[in-house]
Swiss-Prot record:
Pfam family, any one: NAD_Gly3P_dh_N
Residue sites binding NADPH per the record: S15, Y16, H36, K110, A143, R259, V283, E285
Annotated keywords: Cytoplasm, Lipid biosynthesis, Lipid metabolism, NAD, NADP, Nucleotide-binding, Oxidoreductase, Phospholipid biosynthesis, Phospholipid metabolism
Binding-site positions, sn-glycerol 3-phosphate: K110, G139, T141, K195, D248, S258, R259, N260
Entry protein name: Glycerol-3-phosphate dehydrogenase [NAD(P)+]
Family statement drawn from the similarity comment of this UniProt entry: Belongs to the NAD-dependent glycerol-3-phosphate dehydrogenase family.
Lineage top rank: taxon: Bacteria
Swiss-Prot/TrEMBL GO biological process terms: carbohydrate metabolic process; glycerol-3-phosphate biosynthetic process; glycerol-3-phosphate catabolic process; glycerophospholipid biosynthetic process
Function field: Catalyzes the reduction of the glycolytic intermediate dihydroxyacetone phosphate (DHAP) to sn-glycerol 3-phosphate (G3P), the key precursor for phospholipid synthesis.
Coiled-coil ranges (or none): none
Cellular-component GO terms for this entry: cytosol
Length: 339
């Protein structure tokens, strides 16, 4: 591979970053995958697979591993960031001085900035300036299924139409990976944060033993909360009926591959927050997202009762069953009301 001729550099060698890198490479593109741990990258190079997360999926020949950040960023103008939301800004500040002058940045990170609750587009603009084209991909994607080449569909939004077109062409694979473009940059970002919160609630409901009726009601009312918050932020309500909204919400709330759902189930079964996090063993994005989404809702005056009760369980010690009873005991309302 020419040192400056890769189609994409992927920043983040966890399960999802690796799965996206495999997907791009399987499409015939030269891809560089960078990880912050040199020992981990050396292991990936040796094994030609990510044995920790995706042990049954060998790397295509066009997937190249790199532990030197400068070398990785020099390899391509297209940078795909796949890191947890709480380190997103830190990673962007780290890569900024090493990026090529023609660089374009897309992220698959789902969530909001830790502590501030800002959209990641605002974090990116602050870290990188106003000139660089930005994009986000989001949707119902479990890493194992994506890496295995099973049919998957996502949404893509960008500040730059040329970048959006290029990304759609790079990522789209007629056999397994369908990429829908969407001009709603805010909505595509927001859906991925709120669904993490609702998935914890769905897990709690199932952990308590409430059944399919309750789970479905929670998903539906969770979608209403997502849509209300999105409208307050200027998103297009139609976005939340697409891949980055309803699609991701249903997937994360109903399948046990979801860490957020499993975390919620443990809480519903009576486990404490810290023990549940330790048992999951990986980042549970919804834990931080709950606090951030709640703060964002308060800032914009949006009522989100499900989010509020999940916050009470995670941060105030409320019992999951008590939280559920609080929701069930709310005053009667018109289903179409804004609260």
């Amino acid at each position: 591979m020419n040192q400056r001729n890769a189609s994409m550099t992927v920043i983040g060698a966890g399960s999802y970053g690796t799965a996206l890198a495999i997907t791009l490479a399987r499409n015939g593109h030269e891809v560089v995958l960078w990880g912050h741990d040199p020992e981990h990258i050396a292991t990936l190079k040796r094994d030609r697979c990510n044995a920790a997360f995706l042990p049954d999926v060998p790397f295509p020949d066009t997937l190249h591993l790199e532990s030197d950040l400068a070398t990785a960023l020099a390899a391509s103008r297209n940078i795909l960031v796949v890191v947890p939301s709480h380190v997103f800004g830190e990673v962007l500040r780290q890569i900024k001085p090493l990026m090529r002058p023609d660089a374009r940045l897309v992220w698959a990170t789902k969530g909001l900035e830790a502590e501030t609750g800002r959209l990641l587009q605002d974090v990116a603009r602050e870290a990188l300036g106003d000139q660089i084209p930005l994009a986000v991909i989001s949707g119902p994607t479990f890493a194992k299924e994506l890496a295995a080449g099973l049919p998957t569909a996502i949404s893509l939004a960008s500040t730059d139409q040329t970048f959006a077109d290029d990304l759609q062409q790079l990522l789209h694979c007629g056999k397994s990976f369908r990429v829908y473009s969407n001009p709603d940059f805010i909505g595509v970002q927001l859906g991925g944060a709120v669904k993490n919160v609702i998935a914890i609630g769905a897990g709690m409901s199932d952990g308590i033993g409430f059944g399919a009726n309750a789970r479905t009601a929670l998903i539906t009312r969770g979608l209403a909360e997502m849509s209300r918050l999105g409208a307050a932020l200027g998103a297009d309500p139609a976005t939340f009926m697409g891949m980055a909204g309803l699609g991701d919400l249903v997937l994360t709330c109903t399948d046990n591959q979801s860490r957020n759902r499993r975390f919620g189930m443990m809480l519903g079964q009576g486990m404490d927050v810290q023990s549940a996090q330790e048992k999951i063993g990986q980042v549970v994005e919804g834990y931080r997202n709950t606090k951030e989404v709640r703060e964002l809702a308060h800032r914009f005056g949006v009522e989100m009762p499900i989010t509020e009760e999940i916050y009470q369980v995670l941060y105030c010690g409320k019992n999951a069953r008590e939280a559920a009873l609080t929701l069930l005991g709310r005053a009667r309302k018109d289903e179409r009301s804004s609260h």
